C-alpha cells in the first residue's frame, strides 16, 4: 500500500493517534472476533446496526428513535381502543449521565448463519421495551416471553428502584439524598444495607454479616483498594496511573 497523503517536512513521525477513534471490532486472546458494522447515512448514521462474529454469523441490530417509539405507542393505543399515554416525541438532549440522542436498541435478529443458512429464526433473538422517558423497561426472549422488568423513580429519570427476573421475587432499592443506594431489599433472599463514609463503605446483609470496602481517590478515580470480608479475610488491590 501507500500513504494517503505525504507528510510535511516538519511533522513528527509517527503521527500521534487521535484521542477518539471509531471502534470497528473486538478480538479476544483466543482469536474470537466481533466485527461492527455502522450505518453510513440517515438518522442512524455512525451507529452500530450490524455485528458479525467469528463463526460468520451476522446479527442485525434494530434501532429506534424516541419519535418512532412514541408513534408506535400511539398506534398500539388506537388499535387497542385505549387512551394514548403521555409519550413525548423527544427526550432532553442532555442529562446528568451525558448526551442523549434518544436512539435505543429495540431488537436483535440473526440474519445469516453459515452453518444453517436456510434455518434462520422468524423472530428476533431478543427484544427490548422502553419507557416514555427512554429507560429500559422490559426484555423479551425469542419466544416473546418477558424475562426482565425494571421500575424507575418517578422524580429522578434513570434511577432504578426495582427489577425482576420472570419467576423470581422483585428486588427493590432505596437511595439517600445524594443518589446512593442505601438498601437492597429481597423478600425471598438476602437483603443488604449500605453505609457510606468518606473512604469506606460498610455492607451488611440480613444475616448481620458485614463487609467493608476501603476506597482511595476522588470522583471518577475512586477505587476500592481493600476489602474486609465477613469471614475476617482481607483482599487488597493496587492500581497503576493509567
Regions found by a protein language model. Name each.
Residues 1-242:
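Extended charged/polar low-complexity repeat regions
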Amino acid at each position: 500500500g501507500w500513504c494517503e497523503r505525504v507528510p510535511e517536512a516538519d511533522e513528527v513521525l509517527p503521527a500521534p493517534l487521535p484521542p477518539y477513534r471509531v471502534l470497528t471490532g473486538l478480538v479476544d486472546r483466543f482469536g474470537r472476533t466481533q466485527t461492527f458494522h455502522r450505518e453510513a447515512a440517515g438518522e442512524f448514521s455512525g451507529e452500530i446496526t450490524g455485528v458479525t462474529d467469528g463463526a460468520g454469523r451476522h446479527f442485525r441490530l434494530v434501532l429506534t428513535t424516541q419519535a418512532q417509539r412514541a408513534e408506535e405507542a400511539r398506534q398500539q393505543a388506537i388499535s387497542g381502543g385505549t387512551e394514548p399515554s403521555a409519550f413525548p416525541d423527544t427526550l432532553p438532549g442532555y442529562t446528568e449521565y451525558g448526551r442523549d440522542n434518544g436512539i435505543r436498541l429495540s431488537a436483535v435478529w440473526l440474519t445469516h448463519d453459515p452453518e444453517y443458512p436456510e434455518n434462520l429464526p422468524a423472530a428476533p433473538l431478543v427484544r427490548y421495551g422502553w419507557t416514555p422517558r427512554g429507560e429500559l423497561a422490559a426484555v423479551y426472549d425469542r419466544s416473546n416471553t418477558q424475562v426482565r422488568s425494571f421500575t424507575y423513580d418517578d422524580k429522578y429519570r434513570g434511577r432504578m428502584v426495582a427489577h425482576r427476573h420472570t419467576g423470581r421475587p422483585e428486588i427493590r432499592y432505596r437511595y439517600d439524598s445524594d443518589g446512593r443506594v442505601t438498601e437492597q431489599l429481597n423478600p425471598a433472599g438476602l437483603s443488604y444495607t449500605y453505609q457510606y463514609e468518606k473512604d469506606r463503605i460498610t455492607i451488611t446483609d440480613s444475616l448481620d454479616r458485614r463487609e467493608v470496602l476501603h476506597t482511595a481517590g476522588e470522583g471518577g478515580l475512586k477505587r476500592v483498594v481493600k476489602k474486609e470480608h465477613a469471614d475476617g479475610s482481607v483482599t487488597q488491590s493496587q492500581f497503576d496511573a493509567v
